UniProtKB/Swiss-Prot annotation:
Topological category with respect to the lipid bilayer: Multi-pass membrane protein
Organism of provenance: Homo sapiens (Human)
PANTHER family membership: CONNEXIN (PTHR11984), GAP JUNCTION GAMMA-3 PROTEIN (PTHR11984:SF56)
GO CC, alphabetical: connexin complex; myelin sheath
Lineage: Eukaryota, Metazoa, Chordata, Craniata, Vertebrata
Residue ranges, annotated region (Disordered): 238-279
Primary subcellular site in the record, as a coarse category: membrane
One example GO MF annotation: gap junction channel activity
Official protein name in the record: Gap junction gamma-3 protein
UniProt-listed GO biological process terms: cell-cell signaling; myelination; sensory perception of sound
Length: 279
């Protein structure tokens, strides 16, 4: 029973998405998580401890580091992943509710075969529940697109594309301009650009998924209208042909045939007396 329920849930999750949404977006999300977990702490774990300022003024180093990084890049990326995953989690919860509701409605899941087979057919034919799921999927893609774009803009505003090797600090309680140095700026720059590229690909593929969904829906609508018009023309032609056929008399015997043909028969024409006009 659990296996059938999971198959139905997975089928309902993937029936509205394209290969981009089924494969590329989850792979990029998993790659981002692995990259953060495996390399993030090693690259940015020492950013505060190795942040060296040329001063002995108490509190100056902490104030300069706060001015240089108001938000740690590692914490920013973790927050970004969680924030981007929220729309997908909400959509999965909505789909789970939809599947449970239909599961209880169908009793023992008799609609499983129809649901799985429906992935190969037209997915816009089902009723209002399927349409709500489709719009929920589009809404979560739109939310992810907005969140990814906002995160990319905020990342560029906070960190730019390159991690500098030194930073000139002018903050209290520092006396004048203080120069601070960072450890391994090149490694941090490479990781910063990598995370920027992964976020850019996620943004691009999310937009591509929306475009493919729109094109697919337009194609199915056009195909449905085309098939409907062909069916209407065929039905109209058949109706007219049937009407024309029904208007003709049904000939069953020779006498009925002779009555149906306008004028007289050949035998009656021979028996007609010859008048002066015929002579």
């Amino acid at each position: 029973m659990c296996g059938r329920f999971l198959r139905r849930l997975l089928a309902e999750e993937s029936r509205r998405s394209t290969p981009v949404g089924r494969l590329l977006l989850p792979v990029l999300l998993g790659f981002r998580l692995v990259l953060l977990a495996a390399s993030g702490p090693g690259v940015y774990g020492d950013e505060q401890s190795e942040f060296v300022c040329h001063t002995q003024q108490p509190g100056c180093k902490a104030a300069c580091f706060d001015a240089f990084h108001p938000l740690s890049p590692l914490r920013f990326w973790v927050f970004q992943v969680i924030l981007v995953a929220v729309p997908s989690a909400l959509y999965m919860g909505f789909t789970l509710y939809h599947v449970i509701w239909h599961w209880e409605l169908s009793g023992k899941g008799k609609e499983e075969e129809t649901l799985i087979q429906g992935r190969e057919g037209n997915t816009d034919v089902p009723g209002a529940g399927s349409l709500r799921l489709l719009w929920a999927y589009v809404a979560q893609l739109g939310a992810r697109l907005v969140l990814e774009g906002a995160a990319l803009g905020l990342q560029y505003h906070l960190y730019g594309f390159q991690m500098p090797s030194s930073f000139a600090c002018r903050r209290e309680p520092c006396l004048g301009s203080i120069t601070c140095n960072l450890s391994r700026p090149s490694e941090k720059t490479i990781f910063l650009k990598t995370m920027f590229g992964v976020s850019g690909f996620c943004l691009l593929f999310t937009f591509l998924e929306l475009v493919l969904l729109g094109l697919g829906r337009w194609w199915r609508t056009w195909k449905h209208k085309s098939s409907s018009s062909k069916y209407f023309l065929t039905s109209e032609s058949t109706r007219r042909h049937k009407k024309a056929t029904d208007s003709l008399p049904v000939v069953e015997t020779k006498e009925q045939f002779q009555e149906a043909v306008p004028g007289r028969s050949l035998a009656q024409e021979k028996q007609r007396p010859v008048g002066p006009r015929d002579a």
